[in-house]
Amino acid sequence: MSNQEYIHQAEHRISVVINTYNASQHLAEVLETVKDFDEVVICDMESTDNTLDIARKYGCKIVIFPRGNYQICEPARQTAIDAASCKWVLVVDADELVTPELKQYLYSLIGKEDAPQGLYVPRKSRFMGRFMHCFYPDYQLRFFIRKDTVWPAIIHADPVIKGRIEKIPAAHADMPLDHLADNSIASRMGKINQYTANEIEKKKDRNYGMAALFYRPFVRFFRAYIQKGGFRDGKEGFICACYEGIYQFVAVSKIIEDRMKKRK
């Protein structure tokens, strides 16, 4: 192989990066869908189940990130990305499946001279046992050039990417990540406090008042139930849309509370 051919090959390689902690429930199924990528990196936060045994079975590259008191995976994202050796990185959660069509699309994309430096990938999610239209396309910024990307250690943070970012059109129904987690009402309500706490930092400069407590939850509900088609999902869709409104109400309330505390 000539030096030019080697460089060309290196430019068209993809590392799949997965952060794990006690992820044995779905990990084997996930790894089956990504095993044919150029590299699979598992960044584990000291799992106590057989997560690492599964990763070794599939020949994954394994790095360990000390869990400490962390309850989220974001602090370990950058460690996982840095452990990858390929130019391009696809970040996949330990409960997300990658379709053959998505894989083909990504390899085709990086072969183009005008390929973007980052790509939003749509994701299908479940609630109360069924796919939810009100969540879709739930875009995730998961594909990018490794050396041009930094991932903040903040819950639900998007990576910071140097360069142009594009989206896979939501109409490509065969390309979304398939999120296996089947969220129940209890699990989603249990996450509200954790997730909305992050909204305080993200939106600390927003001057929300009483009006925002009314219109923001309503807009969130309307978008989920009407605009995104939650009405097609029956009672589950209505409950899901209500949850979206409740989430927004709690988030705005916390932002207002934080501002009031700082004024005292």
Model-derived features: positions:
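Conserved donor nucleotide-binding strand/loop of the catalytic core
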Residues: 52-85
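Catalytic-site signature of metal-activated, phosphate-bearing donor transferases
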Residues: 74-75, 81, 92, 99-262
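Acidic helix N-cap motif at the loop->helix transition within catalytic regions
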Residues: 25-28, 49-58, 101-102
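A conserved acidic beta->alpha catalytic loop
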Residues: 33, 44-53
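Short, well-formed alpha-helical segments that are part of the catalytic scaffolds
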Residues: 17-36
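Short, structured coil segments at secondary-structure junctions
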Residues: 36, 57-59, 139
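Cell-envelope/extracellular polymer assembly enzymes that use nucleotide-activated donors
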Residues: 13-15, 39
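Short aromatic/hydrophobic "clamp" motif used to bind/position activated sugar donors
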Residues: 89
